[in-house]
C-alpha cells in the first residue's frame, strides 16, 4: 500500500489506514448528481419563462438576474466536475502531488464563482419581493436594504479574503510541494462562510412573511401563499448539509475524498435555490393543469379570492386599494390571487 502512494502525499497526510480502499472513487456518482441538479435548475428557469409567455407579461429584472445566476452555477458545476477528473472523490493516497495541486487551483476559482452565484440568486429573490410587495412601510424597506447588504457583502468578503488567502497567493496550491509561505486557516474560513450563507438564506426567506399575513384574505389562504415562498427552506436544509461536509473536510487529512460531497452540495445548494426562486412564478402552468383536470372531473376552482369594496375618496378605500395592489402583484408574478373590485358611485 505504501509503495502505491506518492511519497510526497505520504509526507503530507501520513500513511493510509490499513483498511483504506485506494481504488474507491466517487467522481462518477458526484458528476451524475451535479449534472442532475443542474438540469433541474435549467428546467425550472425554462418553465418560469414559459409561464411568463402564457401570462403575456414582460420579462423583469429578477428574471434576467436568475439567468445570470444559472450561468455562474454552470461554471461551478464545470469546475466541480474538473475537480473529480483530477481526483476529488478519491482518497488522497490515490492521487499524486500534481493532481492535488490542480484540485486546489480549481477550489480557488470555485470559491469566487460559488459566492457570486449565491449572491446573485438572493438579489433575484429580493427584486421579486420589491415588485410584488408595494409597501411603503419603513420596517419592510429597511429589511429589504439589509437583505441587499447581506447579499452583496458576502461575495465581496469572500473575494477579498481569497485574494489574500496566502502569501504568496500561489502558496494556496503549491504549499503541498513544500514552498515557503503562509495561509489563513482555510478550512475554518470555508466553514464560517457556509454558516454565514445559511443565516443569510434564513433572513431573506423570512422578509415577506409579515407582509403576507397582512393581506386581506383568509388565514388559510395567507398561509398557502407563505408556504409557496417558504419552499426556499429547502435551500437552508441544503446549506446545513453542506456545512456538515465542510466540517468533515476541516477535520480530515483525506481532503480529496472529503471534497467530493463538498463539491456536490456546493452545487446542489444554489441549484435548489434557483428552483425555489422559480416556483412562485409557475402558477399559470399549474392552473392549466388544474383547468384540464376540472374540465375532466368537474372539480371546482379553488383560486384565492380577495374582494375589496372601494368607496371613493375614503381613507379606508385607499388602504384597501394598497393591500389589493400587493395581492394583485402576487397574482401577476405567479402566486394566483384573484382580486375583484366593487366600485360604488353616488348618483347625483
What positions do the PLM features span?
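Juxtamembrane membrane-interface segments at transmembrane-helix boundaries in membrane proteins
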Residues: 16-31, 97-106, 180-186
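Extracellular loop 3-seventh transmembrane helix
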Residues: 34, 107-118, 181-200, 222-290
Amino acid at each position: 500500500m505504501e509503495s502505491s502512494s506518492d511519497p510526497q502525499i505520504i509526507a503530507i497526510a501520513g500513511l493510509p489506514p490499513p483498511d483504506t480502499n485506494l481504488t474507491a472513487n466517487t467522481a462518477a456518482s458526484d458528476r451524475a448528481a451535479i449534472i442532475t441538479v443542474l438540469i433541474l435548475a435549467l428546467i425550472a428557469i425554462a418553465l418560469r419563462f414559459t409561464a411568463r409567455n402564457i401570462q403575456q407579461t414582460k420579462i423583469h429584472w429578477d428574471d434576467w438576474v436568475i439567468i445570470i445566476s444559472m450561468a455562474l452555477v454552470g461554471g461551478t458545476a464545470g469546475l466541480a466536475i474538473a475537480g473529480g477528473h483530477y481526483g476529488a472523490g478519491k482518497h488522497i493516497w490515490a492521487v499524486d502531488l500534481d493532481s492535488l495541486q490542480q484540485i486546489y487551483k480549481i477550489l480557488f476559482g470555485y470559491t469566487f464563482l460559488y459566492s457570486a452565484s449565491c449572491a446573485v440568486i438572493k438579489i433575484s429573490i429580493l427584486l421579486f419581493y420589491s415588485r410584488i410587495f408595494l409597501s411603503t412601510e419603513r420596517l419592510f424597506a429597511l429589511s429589504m436594504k439589509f437583505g441587499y447588504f447581506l447579499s452583496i457583502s458576502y461575495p465581496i468578503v469572500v473575494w477579498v479574503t481569497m485574494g489574500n488567502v496566502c502569501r504568496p497567493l500561489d502558496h494556496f496550491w503549491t504549499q503541498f510541494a513544500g514552498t515557503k509561505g503562509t495561509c489563513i486557516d482555510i478550512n475554518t474560513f470555508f466553514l464560517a462562510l457556509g454558516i454565514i450563507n445559511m443565516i443569510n438564506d434564513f433572513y431573506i426567506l423570512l422578509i415577506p412573511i409579515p407582509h403576507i399575513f397582512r393581506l386581506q384574505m383568509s388565514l388559510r389562504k395567507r398561509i398557502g401563499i407563505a408556504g409557496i415562498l417558504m419552499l426556499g427552506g429547502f435551500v437552508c436544509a441544503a446549506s446545513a448539509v453542506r456545512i456538515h461536509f465542510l466540517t468533515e473536510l476541516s477535520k480530515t487529512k483525506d481532503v480529496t475524498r472529503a471534497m467530493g460531497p463538498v463539491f456536490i452540495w456546493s452545487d446542489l445548494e444554489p441549484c435548489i435555490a434557483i428552483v425555489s426562486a422559480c416556483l412562485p412564478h409557475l402558477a399559470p402552468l399549474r392552473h392549466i393543469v388544474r383547468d384540464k383536470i376540472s374540465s375532466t372531473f368537474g372539480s371546482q376552482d379553488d383560486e384565492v379570492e380577495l374582494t375589496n369594496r372601494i368607496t371613493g375618496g375614503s381613507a379606508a378605500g385607499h388602504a384597501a386599494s394598497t393591500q389589493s395592489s400587493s395581492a394583485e402583484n402576487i397574482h401577476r408574478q405567479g402566486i394566483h390571487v384573484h382580486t375583484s373590485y366593487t366600485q360604488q358611485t353616488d348618483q347625483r
